[in-house]
Amino acid sequence: MNAEIKKYLEESLQNKKGLTFYVNGNTVNGYVIRIVDDVTVEVRNQSSSKVLVFLDRLDAIAMS
């Protein structure tokens, strides 16, 4: 896992800060509820209680 991406993920996990994940031309908004492993994180948002994001498909990440 990239060190910069890990900083974003850990801050979201600790402080429930929102992130926008850009994945294959789509966006997924939410905050991290669990870092599963080096390539997968579990995210929660208003419409879904659990979303798995595969970091190997990640184009970009932005913090709200």
Model region roles, listed by residue range:
Residues 1-29, 37-40, 44-64:
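Short glycine-rich, low-complexity segments
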